[in-house]
């Protein structure tokens, strides 16, 4: 696997020098300063590429080229935003950057309720608490019809939880959910958030798939023409939330994408921490079935709790994800490609890490502190080395 590291640009508290010392050779980054929907110019792409290469690294993957909400709702200037997206892909290809991670999650990107969940060893992790999320949706957001998405027990527990929250607790929970986590390109006030949710009131799973198909049928031929590999990131968490449909959550969703636009440019990001939240997702089977289309991997693990919809981010080699079997399946896919004469490795990044050691004293991007990811990268690197030596060395 190609060892990569997500970097949020010049304002990231983790420097490119840090990235290189961590042992990564590739950088995963994006032009976050360009508004959603606008074209990434060749000039801006080359500026970022030069910064990365001057540090002795390569820009391996774009994560992400965000998709404008008009495209997801099939309203407004969606045709112009699609045309802009096509041009951005052409410009990236011209600059030699040919792997693009993206997602089609409506309104929100990845979602957590607690950004400082303290683990038994004193390090901090990200957590999604189903009851806290219900408390937000039922008692802070007050979304009409939200009760239908929860069990009677969850509704009762959410009422108790809300009653014990201080004003600061409520404000923190609201910020965590709607203000935008690292990599998310949108942040909202509560009123703005309600208005954006309203735009989806008539969009169910079938309709969102229809809108996604319009996007894919416009984008994938351009990607194929210029040699760009599109790698869709799964929903996080991989299930409907806030009354919003989610359409990249299961192996059935992956098959739908392939059936909709059957091009090798139409591929996947295997994010084990997102897909792995669902007990019914067999990660190894997903890799084996769609291996030739996996162009990027995010390797991390989560741990489901007593309420199976509640989870926290576990250490990379712990939790519900069998990281050994996952890495073995990825390495097997790389060797299959090599047998076909393809030499490209699959970029992997240690997705998220615990806030630990000296980073506990620093301001860090949630999930993206240096030391936790350094630990995760080293652990995954060790797993891969053992697999390569045991099964593939001659």
Curated annotation (Swiss-Prot):
Pfam families, sorted: UxuA
Domain of life: Bacteria
EC nos: 4.2.1.8
Coiled coil: none
Any one of the GO BP annotations: D-glucuronate catabolic process
Cofactor(s) named in the record: Fe(2+); Mn(2+)
Catalytic activity: D-mannonate = 2-dehydro-3-deoxy-D-gluconate + H2O
Entry-linked InterPro entries: Man_deHydtase, Xyl_isomerase-like_sf
Cystine pairs: none
Biochemical pathway: Carbohydrate metabolism; pentose and glucuronate interconversion
Gene3D superfamilies: Divalent-metal-dependent TIM barrel enzymes
GO MF: ferrous iron binding; manganese ion binding; mannonate dehydratase activity
Keyword field: Iron, Lyase, Manganese
Function: Catalyzes the dehydration of D-mannonate.
NCBIfam families given in the database record: PRK03906.1, uxuA
Family note: Belongs to the mannonate dehydratase family.
Identification of the protein by name: Mannonate dehydratase
């Amino acid at each position: 696997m190609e060892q990569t590291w997500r970097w949020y640009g010049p304002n990231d508290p983790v420097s490119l020098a840090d990235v290189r010392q961590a042992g990564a050779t590739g950088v995963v980054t994006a032009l976050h300063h360009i508004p959603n929907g606008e074209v990434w110019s060749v000039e801006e792409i080359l500026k970022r590429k030069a910064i990365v290469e001057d540090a002795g690294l390569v820009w391996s993957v774009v994560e992400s080229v965000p998709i404008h909400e008009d495209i997801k709702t099939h309203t407004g200037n969606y045709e112009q935003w699609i045309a802009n997206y096509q041009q951005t892909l052409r410009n990236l290809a011209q600059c030699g950057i040919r792997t693009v991670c993206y997602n089609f999650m409506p309104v929100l990107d990845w979602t957590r309720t607690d950004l400082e969940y303290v683990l038994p060893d004193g390090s901090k992790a990200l957590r999604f608490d189903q009851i806290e999320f219900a408390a937000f949706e039922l008692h802070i957001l007050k979304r009409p019809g939200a009760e239908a998405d929860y069990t009677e027990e969850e509704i009762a527990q959410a009422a108790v939880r809300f009653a014990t929250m201080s004003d600061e607790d409520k404000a923190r929970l609201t910020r965590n959910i709607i203000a935008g986590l690292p990599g998310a390109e949108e942040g909202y006030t509560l009123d703005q958030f309600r208005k954006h949710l309203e735009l989806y009131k008539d969009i169910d799973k079938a309709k969102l798939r229809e809108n996604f198909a319009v996007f894919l049928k416009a984008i994938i031929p351009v990607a194929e023409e210029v040699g760009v590999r599109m790698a869709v990131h799964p929903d996080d968490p991989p299930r409907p939330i806030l009354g919003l449909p989610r359409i990249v959550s299961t192996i059935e969703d992956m098959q739908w994408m392939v059936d909709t636009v059957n091009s090798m440019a139409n591929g996947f990001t295997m994010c084990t921490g997102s897909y792995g939240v669902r007990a019914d997702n067999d990660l190894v089977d997903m890799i084996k079935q769609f291996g030739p289309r996996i162009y990027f991997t995010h390797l991390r693990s989560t741990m489901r709790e007593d309420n199976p919809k509640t989870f926290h981010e576990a250490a990379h080699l712990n939790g519900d994800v069998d990281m050994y079997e996952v890495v073995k399946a990825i390495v097997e896919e790389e060797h299959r490609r090599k047998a076909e004469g393809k030499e490209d490795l699959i970029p992997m990044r240690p997705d998220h890490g615990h806030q630990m050691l000296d980073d506990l004293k620093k301001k860090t991007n949630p999930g993206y502190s240096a030391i936790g990811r350094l630990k995760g990268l080293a652990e995954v690197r060790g797993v891969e080395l053992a697999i390569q030596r045991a099964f593939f060395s001659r």
